[in-house]
Swiss-Prot record:
Organism this protein belongs to: Christiangramia forsetii (strain DSM 17595 / CGMCC 1.15422 / KT0803)
Topology versus the membrane: Peripheral membrane protein
Name of encoding gene: atpD
Name listed for the protein in its UniProt record: ATP synthase subunit beta
GO cellular component, one term: proton-transporting ATP synthase complex
InterPro entries, sorted: AAA+_ATPase, ATP-synt_VA_C, ATP_synth_F1_bsu, ATPase_a/bsu_AS, ATPase_alpha/beta_chains, ATPase_F1/V1/A1_a/bsu_N, ATPase_F1/V1/A1_a/bsu_N_sf, ATPase_F1/V1/A1_a/bsu_nucl-bd
């Protein structure tokens, strides 16, 4: 079938109307991609959003429409946007339309070499039902809101409380310990963070560019001629970026582009064997925000707080694809920006419904200098049950929560009347709760250059032992400061002994 061509009729920012005047040809289908070849030879991709009239389609551009004019030829591809898949995507960086942005050349994505970004979620009978805990080495997460393998995890927090650092630490810990493949979708976040992440992954060996390149990088260079393409195939991560400076069309689709690569590895298509994949999204709120911009540009009536009326539908269509099947699993970690620290805002509230575990980052805890600034009372996990975790873990987690809840209730009394007015029992509870609160912090590998402290991974057995010792009163003699930013309880005891000796 010959490809259908049309002409640009109207351009309003990223929204482009295209007229197809041939009588017999079919209009492109919804979500099909159209291509415009610019004067400099570069290709601008449009995605069909709606049919208006008999011969006109309204599309959203995946790149800037600067310099575009009416009357330019548009080619209908007959397919949705395609992403390259296969072993060659290991260690590579792509944009929303599957073009390489790492300077190492494009990969083929036509026919069998690619997959469309719009796909159906797996059928119900293909889903996996087993529950297995995924330990991260981060005490507060493993103890109080444990993550499940193949589950969906949300990191909620306002601006600047540490979502991206926590995601980077999770990539570092899980990707190293888990040895599987990671796919990272950067959705509408800072380009600088994407650059930092790539360097971090190269230094930790999750992405491999070869020894020659690493020597040039250590000397301050970035010589892509030295990249070893064969060694690169041993990499354990793939990146897909659509950052803050991209038009809303790209930001609204880049999460789907990353997900398509993750689905390919989960299903084992072409390789015969499915894999366990980690899928990181930073930031899922920007996906909603871009959808809201596109919706307004397309002239749809806004709903609550100015969001698109299709908010729940769009979120559901994406989240239902992030799932585990009998072939393999996708464990997803999604950072969720919380506008004005309001968890009832429609964007974070819609995301909540899809998650198995939520890690809520709190500004109040960050202000105390406790990092990661996870709020143990607001954070939840579906698998925090004795059946899955065992009695010892479950009982310890519940005791920690009860103690912190008691401390929270007493804070108003302390603020008004002071500590002296509390009973002896409550004074003891407060002093232990403050130690527990500080011991929930730990130094991160990815923050070593800021803290000057070596990052640690803490085994769950050591975590449980440490918190039980604090709550049983075995460590009441040590000052609170001894417990801050420590890994195991032995480190805290050592620091406490030192402080006591100095006094």
């Amino acid at each position: 079938m010959s490809k259908v061509t049309g002409k640009v009729a109207q351009i309003i920012g990223p929204v482009v109307d295209v007229v197809f005047d041939s009588e017999n040809a079919e209009l492109p289908k919804i979500y099909d991609s159209l291509e415009i070849t610019r004067k400099d030879g570069s290709i601008l991709v449009l995605e069909v959003q709606s049919h208006i009239g008999e011969q006109t389609v309204r599309t959203v551009s995946m790149d800037s429409t600067d310099g575009l004019s009416r009357g330019v030829d548009v080619l209908a591809t007959g397919n949705p946007i395609q992403m390259p898949v296969g072993k060659d995507v290991y260690g590579r960086l792509f944009n929303v339309i599957g073009d390489a942005i790492d300077g190492l050349g494009n990969l083929p994505k036509a026919g069998e070499d690619g997959l469309p970004i719009h796909r159906q979620a797996p059928k119900f009978e293909d889903l996996s039902v087993s529950t297995e805990v995924l330990f991260t080495g981060i005490k507060v997460i493993d103890l109080i809101e444990p993550y499940s393998k193949g589950g969906k995890i949300g990191l909620f927090g306002g601006a600047g409380v540490g979502k991206t650092v926590l995601i980077q630490e999770l990539i570092n810990n899980i990707a190293k310990g888990h040895g599987g493949l990671s796919v990272f979708a950067g959705v509408g976040e800072r380009t600088r963070e994407g650059n930092d992440l790539l360097r971090e992954m190269l230094e930790s060996g999750i992405i491999k560019y070869g020894d020659d390149f690493m020597h040039s990088m250590e000397e301050g260079g970035w010589d892509l001629q030295k990249v070893d393409k064969e060694v690169m195939k041993e990499s354990k991560a793939t990146f897909v970026f659509g950052q803050m400076n991209e038009p809303p069309g790209a930001r609204a689709r880049v999460a789907l582009s990353g997900l398509t690569i993750a689905e390919y590895f989960r299903d084992g298509a072409g390789e015969g064997q499915g894999k366990d994949v980690l899928f990181f999204v930073d930031n899922i709120f920007r996906f909603t925000q871009a959808g809201s911009e596109v919706s307004a540009l397309l002239g749809r009536m806004p709903s609550a707080v100015g969001y698109q009326p299709t908010l729940a539908t769009e979120m559901g269509a994406m989240q239902e694809r992030i799932t585990s099947t009998k072939n393999g699993s996708i464990t997803s970690v999604q950072a969720v920006y919380v506008p004005a620290d309001d968890l009832t805002d429609p964007a974070p509230a819609t995301t909540f419904a899809h998650l198995d575990a939520t890690t809520v980052l709190s500004r109040k805890i960050a202000e105390l200098g406790i990092y990661p600034a996870v709020d143990p009372l607001d954070s939840t996990s579906r698998i925090l049950t004795a059946d899955i975790l065992g009695d010892e873990h479950y009982d310890c987690a519940q005791r920690v929560k009860e103690l912190l809840q008691r401390y929270k209730e007493l804070q108003d009394i302390i603020a008004i009347l002071g500590m002296e007015e509390l009973s002896e029992e409550d004074k003891l509870a407060v002093s232990r709760a403050r130690r527990v609160q500080r011991f929930l912090s730990q130094p991160f590998h990815v923050a070593e250059q800021f803290t000057g402290l070596k990052g640690v991974l803490v085994d769950i057995k050591d975590t449980i032992k440490g918190f039980n010792m604090i709550m049983d009163g075995e460590l009441d003699k040590y000052p609170e400061a001894a417990f801050n930013l420590k890994g195991t309880i032995e480190e805290a005891i050592e620091a406490g002994e030192k402080m006591l000796a100095e006094n």
